[in-house]
């Protein structure tokens, strides 16, 4: 541009881009970086990876159930062979997902009867449009953020001839089991304005957090409205978890302000995302440990501490995004709330007396600090990975060191059952031969789902009904146990990985031990 043009003071020559990169404040840059980091971790952040693990688990779980529910074996095997696009509507259905999870728990606990998933699935007609069974009942059919997932709105539910009536009955039972309250806790049927307000809040969330917003919304299957009660008073919102999988329920009053809608959707969908991520492995060896919470009267279980920390880190990023919201967002959606959106401290607690722990950052520091001081071995490798990831994201917005870094996961095998620590080592009688003479054999009755894009192998033991997730190293060693003796396994491992003989021997020995302890080798 010429000097003459500038001196003319013409509006065209002096116009500045709306959001020039060179004028962006450091705070906005930090939000952008943290937003991206929250979807980068392949185990906990990358929604596509989480989805693929859940699809593999759903597929192998259906095949496992077919082994123990022969009356519904054909439909269960058909489900186990279905492709991703066919499985997702079933996996996202709250009634079917609840039945599936309940049946897996029965298998893991040694129960071999009373299954419900196969019975329900066998009575549901095929749906060429790709809608889940419960979704077919919704009238009118509304998808509030069709660009970011297949969530639908709980409107009037009419089974008609589309699905068995018992499906509607079961959905209502799951709803009733998710919230407290009497007759006033009936679902609130939303009108067009409520549905539009919900979609508007979702648009705001994805505008504030263009990476996290679409990611977490993709883990929601259904959004309903209610005026139920909770232990802390009128229900504001909840995420279904095990009782009502993939579902969010919220009070209609939360739709009055799009910023509140965005925060509510973030809050509950973050929980649903972690729920899905945790299907692929445990975080703790002692999840029931009691933890004092200064802003609450009642201690929390340790697993709840991790879930809360996961949410509060996301909330930190969201609140920073709100504080730095672009003028065009404020013009479209109005002024954001002046204060920080965080649930209030319980009266009578230490925090209430001291005026502390009223912000998300204070709570992140406390929860992360407590976890960092847990005894060694309390966190599984996946738990340590979660803590490292959350710590790295927090450091972008809160550079003050407040936790000891979680120790890095030791390199080596990972063959841990999903719901329990590894089984005891095989009896000595099965391992009389010396390590150089023994021929490791794979246990019979193992189902498999390879996931080469992730370097993982999912196995299901039809005898013990446990699931095992193997990393790339353990997968390779397991695959080489095809009748070779240990020296041959070590030699082939060294050839394929390019490691020297001592390192190969160390890796293979550790993997074999873990695979034996998990019951996958004899």
Q: Which sequence ranges carry the predicted segments?
A:
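Metalloprotease/metallohydrolase-associated module, dominated by Zn2+-dependent proteases
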Residues: 214-219, 225-232, 237-243, 252-255, ...
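Auxiliary, metal-adjacent structural segments of Zn-dependent hydrolase domains
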Residues: 175-243, 254-255
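Histidine-centered catalytic/metal-binding microenvironments
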Residues: 371-417
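Post-HEXXH active-site segment of zinc metalloproteases
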Residues: 255-264, 272-303
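Acidic, low-complexity/disordered tracts enriched in E/D and polar residues
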Residues: 2-9, 22, 26-74, 416-479
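Long, charge-dense tracts
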Residues: 22-182, 188
């Amino acid at each position: 541009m010429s000097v003459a043009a500038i001196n003319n003071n013409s509006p065209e020559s002096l116009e500045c881009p709306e959001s020039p990169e060179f004028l962006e404040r450091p705070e906005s840059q930090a939000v952008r970086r943290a937003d991206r980091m929250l979807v980068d971790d392949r185990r906990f952040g990358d929604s596509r990876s989480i989805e693929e693990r859940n699809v593999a688990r759903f597929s192998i779980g259906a095949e496992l159930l077919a082994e123990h529910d022969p009356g519904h074996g054909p439909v269960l095997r058909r489900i186990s062979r279905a492709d991703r696009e066919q499985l997702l509507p079933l996996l996202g259905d709250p009634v079917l997902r609840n039945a599936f999870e309940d049946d897996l728990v029965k298998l893991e606990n040694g129960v071999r009867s009373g299954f419900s998933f196969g019975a329900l699935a066998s009575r549901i007609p095929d749906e060429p449009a790709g809608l889940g069974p419960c979704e077919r009942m919704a009238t009118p059919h509304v998808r509030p953020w069709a660009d970011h997932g297949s969530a639908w709105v709980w409107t009037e539910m009419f089974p008609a001839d589309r699905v068995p009536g018992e499906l509607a009955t079961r959905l209502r039972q799951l709803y009733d089991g998710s919230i407290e309250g009497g007759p006033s806790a009936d679902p609130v049927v939303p009108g067009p304005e409520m549905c539009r307000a919900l979609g508007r809040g979702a648009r705001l969330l994805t505008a504030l957090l263009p990476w996290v917003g679409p990611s977490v919304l993709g883990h929601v299957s259904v959004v309903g409205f209610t005026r139920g009660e909770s232990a802390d008073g009128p229900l504001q919102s909840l995420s279904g978890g095990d009782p009502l999988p993939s579902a969010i329920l919220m009070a209609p009053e939360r739709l009055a302000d799009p910023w509140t809608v965005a925060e509510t959707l973030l809050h509950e969908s973050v929980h649903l995302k972690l729920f899905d991520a945790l299907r692929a492995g445990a975080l703790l060896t002692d999840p029931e440990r009691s933890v004092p919470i200064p802003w609450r009267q009642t201690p929390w279980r340790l697993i709840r501490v991790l879930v809360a920390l996961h949410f509060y880190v996301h909330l930190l990023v969201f609140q920073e995004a709100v504080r730095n919201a672009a003028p065009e967002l404020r013009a479209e959606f109005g002024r954001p709330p002046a204060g920080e959106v965080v649930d209030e401290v319980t009266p009578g607690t230490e925090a209430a007396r001291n005026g502390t722990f009223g912000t998300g950052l204070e709570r992140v520091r406390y929860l992360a600090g407590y976890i960092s001081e847990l005894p060694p071995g309390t966190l599984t490798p996946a738990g340590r990975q979660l803590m490292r990831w959350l710590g790295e994201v927090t450091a972008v917005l809160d550079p003050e060191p407040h936790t000891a870094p979680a120790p890095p996961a030791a390199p080596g095998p990972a063959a841990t059952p999903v719901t329990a620590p590894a089984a005891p080592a095989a009896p000595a009688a099965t391992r009389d031969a010396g390590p150089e003479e023994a021929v490791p054999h794979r246990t019979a009755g193992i189902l498999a789902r390879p996931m080469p894009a992730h370097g993982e192998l999912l196995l299901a033991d039809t005898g013990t009904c446990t699931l095992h997730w193997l990393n790339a190293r353990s997968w390779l060693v397991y695959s080489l146990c095809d009748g070779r003796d240990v020296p041959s396994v070590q030699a082939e491992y060294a050839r394929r990985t390019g490691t020297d003989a001592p390192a190969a021997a160390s890796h293979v020995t550790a993997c074999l031990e873990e695979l034996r302890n998990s019951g996958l080798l004899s």
